[in-house]
C-alpha cells in the first residue's frame, strides 16, 4: 500500500521533500503554511493554503497521512496543535515538553548545564535597562537572539563580535518578547543531526551552514543559509553527538523524545559548546540528507513510529552542497520590485528546488509580494557527490544556468569547503 506524506511548509523545503519522497514511492500533499513560496510544492500535486483552511485537521481526516513533516516549529503555536497531538497524528517532531529544547533558549542552555554540556555564557532580559545592566556587570561580545525560537519573532540573530558592537545593538533591538544574550565564541561552527527512535540515538550527518548574505562571509545574516555543506556521518566522527546529544539521554527518555534533533555548536579552545538545538529537519540540510539515504521514506516512517531504524547510505552521495540564488535586493527591504523573469538556460544536472517564484502563462518570475517588500530567495541548487570538491564543482557549474536580473549567489563555496576540511581535520587530530 502506498504511504501518504503531508508536508507543512512552503518553498524549496516543501518542493524538495515532496519530490524526493515521491521518487521513493510516496503519495504526497502539502499544507501551505505561509502566503508565498507556493509554486514548487503546487507543481507536485495537491496543496491547501492556510489562508483557505485555518486548520489542517479536516485535511488530515481526508488525506489520512502516514507521515506529517513540518518545516518549522511554528506549527506548535497554532490553535489546532494540541488537537493534532491528542488525536495521535504522525507528526515528524517531538511533542509536548520535548519541544522545549528548541523553543526556549534559556531552558535549553540550563538543560545543558544540568547534564554537563558546555554552553556559552547567557542571559535572558526583558528590556533595554536590563540589557544595559548585563553589559555593565558582565561585558562581553554577545549574539543577540529572540528568547523564543520562532520564524516570526521580532529579533533574528545579530552576531556582535565586540563589546562595542553589543552596546550599540542593545539600543536598537525590539524587546517585545525580551532578549537572549549568548556569548560570542568565534567562527568554528558546525552542526550534527540525529534521529531518536526505538530508544536509540542514530547519528546522520554533520553540516555547516553559511548565513552571511555575501561572498567572503560579508553582509548581514540572512533568514536562512545562502550555502551549506553536508557530510554523511553515521559514526559521529567529530564527536558532536557524543559530547552534546548523548549526555541528554535521561532527559530524552523522560520526555519521550521521538524524531529528529540537531545540535549547532561552536568549538573554542578545542571544546565543542552547544549554542542551539533544533527539533526538525533543517531547511538547508533536509534535501541533501534525504538524497543521501537509500530508503528515505521507510527511514522517516520508522522514526515517526518510534521503531528501531537501520540506516542505509548511498556511497556515491557522501557529501552534499547547497547554494541559494538570491533575488534583487535580498536580504534587504526593497520597495517596488517589478515582476522579474527567471530563466533556466538548460536543464540542471543536479537538484533545483524553487523558493519564491510565481508562474504566469508558462513564464517564471521572482515573486513581488505587495506586503513583503524584500528581495527574495529564488531557488536552491543542491548537488551530492562521493567527495566534497566534486559536489562543489558540480553545483558551481549548474547554478550558472539560472538567470534573473540582479540576482546573485555566493562565489566562495570552494573556499568554504577548504575551511570545512581544515576545521574537521583539526577536530579529528585532537580526538
Q: Where do the PLM segments sit?
A:
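A conserved helix-loop-beta module that forms one wall/lid of the active-site cleft
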Residues: 94-157, 326
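C-terminal hydrophobic structural anchor segments
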Residues: 333-392
Amino acid at each position: 500500500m502506498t504511504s501518504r506524506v503531508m508536508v507543512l511548509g512552503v518553498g524549496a523545503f516543501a518542493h524538495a521533500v515532496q519530490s524526493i519522497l515521491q521518487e521513493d514511492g510516496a503519495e504526497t500533499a502539502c499544507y501551505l503554511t505561509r502566503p508565498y513560496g507556493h509554486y514548487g510544492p503546487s507543481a507536485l500535486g495537491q496543496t491547501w493554503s492556510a489562508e483557505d483552511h485555518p486548520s489542517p485537521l479536516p485535511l488530515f481526516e481526508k488525506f489520512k497521512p502516514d507521515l506529517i513533516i513540518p518545516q518549522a516549529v511554528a506549527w506548535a503555536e497554532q490553535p489546532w496543535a494540541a488537537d493534532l497531538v491528542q488525536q495521535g497524528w504522525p507528526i515528524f517532531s517531538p511533542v509536548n515538553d520535548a519541544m522545549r529544547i528548541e523553543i526556549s533558549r534559556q531552558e535549553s542552555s540550563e538543560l545543558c548545564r544540568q547534564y554537563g554540556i558546555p554552553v556559552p555564557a547567557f542571559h535572558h532580559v526583558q528590556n533595554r535597562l536590563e540589557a544595559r545592566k548585563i553589559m555593565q556587570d558582565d561585558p562581553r561580545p554577545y549574539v543577540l537572539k529572540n528568547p523564543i525560537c520562532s520564524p516570526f519573532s521580532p529579533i533574528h540573530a545579530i552576531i556582535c563580535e565586540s563589546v562595542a558592537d553589543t552596546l550599540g545593538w542593545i539600543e536598537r533591538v525590539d524587546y517585545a518578547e525580551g532578549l537572549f544574550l549568548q556569548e560570542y565564541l568565534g567562527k568554528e561552527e558546525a552542526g550534527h543531526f540525529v534521529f531518536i527512535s526505538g530508544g536509540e540515538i542514530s547519528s546522520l550527518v554533520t553540516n555547516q551552514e553559511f548565513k552571511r548574505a555575501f561572498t567572503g562571509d560579508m553582509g548581514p545574516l540572512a533568514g536562512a543559509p545562502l550555502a551549506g555543506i553536508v557530510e554523511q556521518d553515521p559514526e559521529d566522527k567529530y564527536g558532536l553527538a557524543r559530547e552534546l546529544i548523548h549526555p541528554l539521554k535521561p532527559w530524552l527518555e523522560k520526555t519521550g523524545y521521538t524524531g529528529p534533533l540537531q545540535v549547532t555548536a561552536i568549538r573554542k579552545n578545542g571544546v565543542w559548546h552547544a549554542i542551539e538545538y533544533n527539533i526538525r529537519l533543517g531547511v538547508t540540510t533536509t534535501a541533501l540528507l534525504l538524497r543521501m539515504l537509500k530508503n528515505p521514506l521507510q527511514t522517516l516512517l520508522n522514526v515517526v513510529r518510534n521503531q528501531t531504524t537501520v540506516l542505509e547510505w548511498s556511497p556515491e552521495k557522501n557529501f552534499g552542497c547547497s547554494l541559494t540564488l538570491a533575488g534583487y535586493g535580498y536580504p534587504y527591504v526593497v520597495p517596488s520590485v517589478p515582476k522579474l523573469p527567471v530563466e533556466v538556460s538548460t536543464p540542471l544536472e543536479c537538484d533545483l528546488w524553487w523558493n519564491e517564484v510565481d508562474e504566469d502563462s508558462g513564464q517564471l518570475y521572482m515573486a513581488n509580494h505587495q506586503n513583503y517588500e524584500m528581495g527574495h530567495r529564488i531557488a536552491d541548487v543542491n548537488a551530492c557527490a562521493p567527495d566534497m570538491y566534486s559536489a562543489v564543482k558540480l553545483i558551481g557549474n549548474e547554478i550558472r544556468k539560472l538567470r534573473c536580473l540582479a540576482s546573485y549567489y555566493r562565489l566562495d563555496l570552494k573556499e568554504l569547503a577548504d575551511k570545512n576540511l581544515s576545521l574537521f581535520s583539526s577536530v579529528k587530530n585532537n580526538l
